[in-house]
Amino acid sequence: MPSHSAAAFSATPSAARDGYVVAVRGAIVDVRFERDALPAVGDALVVTPDDLAPVLAEVQAHLSETMVRALALQTTAGLRRGTRVQAPGGPIETPVGEAVLGRLLDVTGATRDDGPALPAQIERRPIHRAAPPLASLKGTSTLFSTGIKVIDLLAPLAQGGKAAMFGGAGVGKTVLVMELIHAVVERYEGISVFAGVGERSREGHEMLLDMRTSGVLPRTVLVYGQMNEPPGARWRVPFTALTIAEYFRDERRQNVLLLMDNVFRFVQAGAEVSGLLGRMPSRVGYQPTLATEVASLQERIVSVGGVSVTAIEAVYVPADDFTDPAVTAIAAHLDSMVVLSRSMAAEGMYPAVDPIASSSILLDPLVVGEEHAAVATEVRRIIEHYRELQDVISLLGVEELGAEDRALVGRARRLQRFLTQPFAVTEAFTGEPGRSVALADTIAGCKAILAGECDTWQESSLYMIGTLDEGRQREAAAAQQSTAQQAAPAEKEPAA
């Protein structure tokens, strides 16, 4: 597909200033201009080789009165010294408006699907802008229902808030985000914007096909900067997606659901760019501007004037180290943290959400109500006490515990299994239809288990179900089967 990167800005031709390439070092391009034509830091540049598609770059530093250092957002293969460079006179811009709905865009706003080109006169907006002033922000106290039991109960999301799924490799972050897309986007009345940041092209293709199949694509914008693209594209693609979300919030007065997978790749791309620009690394090799870069993205995700942008993000945790500087920098901006546990994934407890480590600022009686807060607190207390007893159980066995502790262990194990549920996005692999559970049913089920109503049930009756009624049916079927087996006539002894 031809590149449309030269259309990633809307400056008039008369405003353009010409320079030429003096050095190319990977994704870094040094460009010389006339003394009075030096572009500003953050401005877009278009490198226009004679025999290749134009390459979009962004000014990162002034090296002298006539030279700038720019970061290319597309491959620099084939560029050479002396290549002409245009400075249109403004920052990188992305197309916004109704025309981008249902489309797949890249970091420059160019279409990357099989649809027609965007209208030539489409409105464009700079991808960099200041966060709204504090006085204009709206608080976040309305629950954002997901239909996922463990999240709605223990780490509820806020309408207009920021939530993230934290986890190492292979614990189910992307599956959880895709289930949220399936469960939430289909019944969401606003606009959805998905930013694929540094993830696999295969996953991006699958998501595009899934959205087409489910019929939600006409109300969704997909913006991809995939794993194979230069660090500049992965570093800037979240801002392109966020700019589109801000347009629908500010101009169309529509609530927006912003999904990002994976925010860690944004930080990782920033570290690559920092190294390419020759900056001194900080802790663990991250860029010295880590906190500033994360804040420049997260602080723009806000609700303004009664219209919300709700963000759900996936965050890769390198080596399962939750003290990693990138992870802690991202976590500082969130309202809800959903932590995925490798040990729970190993036990088959999907979604592998850690009920103790996950948290939300909304889990307060004044926000969620007394009943919800009390049930969530008791569920956490029992599961935490069960974990404290696991060493004793592994050494001596559960029979050595007191009667009260044995009952508590049984309820904790049943709670863990009740908080699992099959997902719609995994139905093709498991054969089990997905379940979406109302919060009231989740609370009622947990209350029944906490009260001991399920103490005699088989644990398997509560595994991978929706509501407690489904578990009750399983238990009744198991009891009926057991009775039938006991009542079956014994086999006749062979004749002597």
UniProtKB/Swiss-Prot annotation:
One of its GO terms (cellular component) is proton-transporting ATP synthase complex. Its main location: membrane. It holds the Pfam family ATP-synt_ab. Keywords: ATP synthesis, ATP-binding, Cell inner membrane, Cell membrane, CF(1), Hydrogen ion transport, Ion transport, Membrane, Nucleotide-binding, Translocase, Transport. Residues 476-489 have a biased composition (Low complexity). The keyword Nucleotide-binding applies. It is found in: Cell inner membrane. Residues 474-496 are annotated as: Disordered. SUPFAM superfamilies: C-terminal domain of alpha and beta subunits of F1 ATP synthase (SSF47917), N-terminal domain of alpha and beta subunits of F1 ATP synthase (SSF50615), P-loop containing nucleoside triphosphate hydrolases (SSF52540). It catalyses: ATP + H2O + 4 H(+)(in) = ADP + phosphate + 5 H(+)(out). It is a peripheral membrane protein. GO terms for molecular function: ATP binding; ATP hydrolysis activity; proton-transporting ATP synthase activity, rotational mechanism. Its EC number is 7.1.2.2. Belongs to the ATPase alpha/beta chains family. Produces ATP from ADP in the presence of a proton gradient across the membrane. The catalytic sites are hosted primarily by the beta subunits. NCBIfam families: atpD. F-type ATPases have 2 components, CF(1) - the catalytic core - and CF(0) - the membrane proton channel. CF(1) has five subunits: alpha(3), beta(3), gamma(1), delta(1), epsilon(1). CF(0) has three main subunits: a(1), b(2) and c(9-12). The alpha and beta chains form an alternating ring which encloses part of the gamma chain. CF(1) is attached to CF(0) by a central stalk formed by the gamma and epsilon chains, while a peripheral stalk is formed by the delta and b chains. This is ATP synthase subunit beta 1. It comes from Paraburkholderia xenovorans (strain LB400).
